[in-house]
Structure formats: structure tokens, C-alpha cells
Amino acid sequence: MAGEQTTTEYISHHLTNWTYGYLPGEGWKVAYTAEEASAMGFKAIHLDSMLWSIGLGIVFCAIFWMVARKVTSGVPGKLQAAVEMIIEFVDNNVRDSYSGTSKLIAPLALTIFVWIFLMNLMDLLPVDFVPGLAGQIGAMMGHDPHHVFFKIVPTTDPNITLGMSFSVFILILFYSIKEKGLGGFVGELTLHPFSAKNPIVQIILIPINFILEFVTLIAKPISLGLRLFGNMYAGELIFILIALMPFWIQWALSVPWAIFHILIITLQAFVFMMLTIVYMSLASSTEH
């Protein structure tokens, strides 16, 4: 594919999602070009990101369900041993970092870690393999393969990463209000970090405290989502740039980068999980 397109077209093609949305003047449709996808703005959905994220979520549930059905107290198989190792790893991190009493946190942390790891893992597939297959299928259906977009790494889509982080944010708000009460939650936003014994001075400090605490609060999901997106997007872009090089250079660069990228894939899933645990622990704590 790289040989049939200019460098700019090739990169743009690999970074454009399969998008369905509302295009001004044409109505609801699948974007035919990157420009159309961009023009759809917020009135659009990335079909490939949704397909892969939901599909990998189903794979995660299916694997763990299958292991749970066949679990044995004797010598475990390789798959059962791997699942037990992951569960124990997540459980230990929850015990070490979470000070609350909710039983939801461990399953939540496990889901986040494995799901994000599987989505990140898609970045190790050859850059042109799945998009190339999608292009061939599109060609058989009468479409120009250069206008068939199909990204396979959901975590390179900020809609996915921010969607997950803001879902965590909703849980943070829920547990903050549940554990501290509405008054305690509002008090955290308005009475800290600055306080005064003089009531008039304290009233003056309330809007200042609110601005500072609100920025701190809203920065949590934004930084959580953008950190994952930025690292995975950069990794994907490097793979794309390597694919543009001569064949013999591709192997020399892609193999070391893929090996190093395994660390990034695992680390980013771990960081997202740990920050979620820490944020949930802070939300459940009655101490500011």
C-alpha cells in the first residue's frame, strides 16, 4: 500500500478511523475521505474503535469465563496459571493501594488492566495487515481501497481512552459523595486548600478554593485518558514510519521496537489501573 500512495496519504490513511456520522450538506453517511471524517466533528462514531474495543472486551470475558468453568485445584493448565497470576497481581495492587471497603474495586481494576492490555496488544500486528484485508474486502464490494479506513488499536483513539477515563471519573464522584456525603464533597471543593477562622475571609476564599480543586478534579480523567492515548498513538506512528522505509530496514527497526513496545503496552495498562485504584482510594477516604 505504501508504494501506491504518497507518504502523506499513507500516514493519513493509517491514522484515519472508519467513521460514520453527520456530514453537513450530505446527511448521515460513512466518511469517504479523512477530510469528511474530520468535518463530521462530534456528530460521528468511530466504527472500528467500537468494534475492536467491544470485541476484545468479549474476548476477555470469554477467556476468564472459560477458565472459571474448568478451574481445578490440582495442577493448573497454562491458561489457568496465567489467569491466576494476573488476578493475584491485580489483587495485591488493590490491597496495597486501596484503603476503602468496596468490593467493586478489584474486579474494576482487573477489567481495566486486561481490557486495556488487549487493546494495546493490537499495536503489535503488522501495520498493513488488517487495514490491507479491509481494503481488499472494500474493493470486492466496489469501493476504492484507498478510501477504506480501518484502525485496529482502540487506545490510539482519544474517544476510547477518554471515554474510559471519564467512566472512572463518574465512579470517583459517586464514591466521594457516598463516603463523605454531599456536604462533605462540596466542602472538599470549597474549603480546601485555603481556610481561615474569620468567616468573611473564608467566604472570600471559597471561589478560589473551588477553582483550584475543580481544576485538580477534572484534570484526573483528562490526564488519565490522554496519557494512554498519547503513548499508544506515538507507538503506532513509529510503526507506520518504519513501514515506509525499505524492506530490509523495516526488519532491522521493527523487531527491536516491537520488543520494546511490549513493555509500553503492559506499562500503560498498569499505569491506568494503578491511577484508577489510587483515585478511587482518595475518593473513599474521609481525610483530605
Swiss-Prot record:
GO molecular function: proton-transporting ATP synthase activity, rotational mechanism
Pfam families according to UniProt: ATP-synt_A (PF00119)
Database matches in InterPro entries: ATP_syn_F0_a_bact/chloroplast, ATP_synth_F0_asu, ATP_synth_F0_asu_AS, F0_ATP_A_sf
Keyword Transmembrane helix: yes
Gene3D superfamilies according to UniProt: ATP synthase, F0 complex, subunit A
Spans through the membrane: 47-67, 104-124, 157-177, 199-219, 237-257, 258-278
Listed GO biological process terms: proton motive force-driven plasma membrane ATP synthesis
Keywords from the named record: ATP synthesis, Cell inner membrane, Cell membrane, CF(0), Hydrogen ion transport, Ion transport, Membrane, Transmembrane, Transmembrane helix, Transport
Membrane topology according to the record: Multi-pass membrane protein
GO cellular component term, pick one: proton-transporting ATP synthase complex
Entry-linked SUPFAM superfamilies: F1F0 ATP synthase subunit A (SSF81336)
Family, similarity comment: Belongs to the ATPase A chain family.
Function: Key component of the proton channel; it plays a direct role in the translocation of protons across the membrane.
Assembly mode: F-type ATPases have 2 components, CF(1) - the catalytic core - and CF(0) - the membrane proton channel. CF(1) has five subunits: alpha(3), beta(3), gamma(1), delta(1), epsilon(1). CF(0) has three main subunits: a(1), b(2) and c(9-12). The alpha and beta chains form an alternating ring which encloses part of the gamma chain. CF(1) is attached to CF(0) by a central stalk formed by the gamma and epsilon chains, while a peripheral stalk is formed by the delta and b chains.
Stated name of the protein: ATP synthase subunit a
Organism: Psychrobacter arcticus (strain DSM 17307 / VKM B-2377 / 273-4)
